[in-house]
Amino acid sequence: MSLSGLRDELAQVRTKKKEFLEQIERIVPWGRWIAMIKPCYYKGERGNKPYDLELMLRLYLLQNLYNLSDEATVAEAMDSRAFSEFCGVESSNQVPDGDTLGRFRNILVHNGLQEQLFAQVIKLLREKGLLLKKGTIVDSTIIAAPSSTKNQDKQRDPDAHQVKKGNEWHFGYKAHIGVDKDSGLVHTLKVTAANVHDVTMTSKLLTGEETVVYGDSGYLGAEKREDAIITNHSGKHIRYKINRRPSQMKKGSARSQAQLKRREHEKSSVRAKVEHVFGVVKGLFRYRKTRYRGLRKQTAKLNMLFALANLILADRRCLLA
């Protein structure tokens, strides 16, 4: 086979990376997102002409999808065929440097655009009837932050805190989410330091339209708090189906324990949907440890990741068609 023939054959090979990026190409609402960012982007009235906004957005999405640094993202855009095709670039001269990508990300953070992009996805899902608002699953996950003081500032991230989970201590942040119980998609996201207790965030994760709330034992007593939402906007009572602690399952007769286990299993089977979205963010996107310091940047990062996770999960279930 000639070199040109081999090159043509390789161009037709569909790698997993290429297939994944073709999915992203199809599901991202490019027009909406670009229109939202454009007013905050460089106008190009002075100095050098800014890089194309869509190119910068595509690079930024790649950075989030693959958990890459600024420098690694632009390097991949030049070296990886799948990345360069996704970005629509043919030579290294068309790709900005890492500092330029970092400045673009800071524009998004400064203007709260990641939160707006997440809200835009929620709006899109509502338009398609994918958020039924009948019930919410509340849950959280810890995102670790570097605990070492061996850095330029000689200190740990001042906005991050430590919390004990089981027998282990964790330092970092916590992503609290409210998930639609029917579709398994995230409708609400709040980011705090890791030491904020789950139950204190319950009311902030509800839409006010649900009739039932599911959560693990970390949310026990949520309905008794002063800020608890007891009735929804229609005046209907909200039921809190919170899993009991294992120690509470050992009381009573064998028959009552069996009945209790069945009820708890039913609650857990509903709650299991929340693990799918965490699986995308921490598994597929590999975001288990922070890259940036400060609650503001962490909130922005997680809003972007959960926006993308919602689109991917909705597409997997053929809900975006």
What are these regions (language model features)?
Residues 34-42, 122, 278, 282:
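Amphipathic, well-packed alpha-helical segments that form the structural scaffold of globular domains
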Residues 1-31, 35-39, 320-321:
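Charged, often Cys/His-bearing segments associated with DNA-binding zinc-finger transcription factors
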Residues 29, 47-54, 93-96, 266, ...:
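Secondary-structure capping and boundary motifs in well-ordered enzyme cores
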Residues 53, 62, 71, 75-78, ...:
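Polybasic low-complexity intrinsically disordered regions
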Residues 42-47, 90, 292-295:
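A short glycine/serine-rich beta->alpha loop
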Residues 65-72, 185, 284-290, 310-321:
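Short helix-capping/linker segments at secondary-structure and domain boundaries
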Residues 21-35, 40-48, 55-71:
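A positively charged, amphipathic N-terminal helix/segment that binds anionic biomolecules
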Residues 211-212, 217-296, 300:
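Helix-centered, glycine/charged polyanion-binding patches within enzymatic domains
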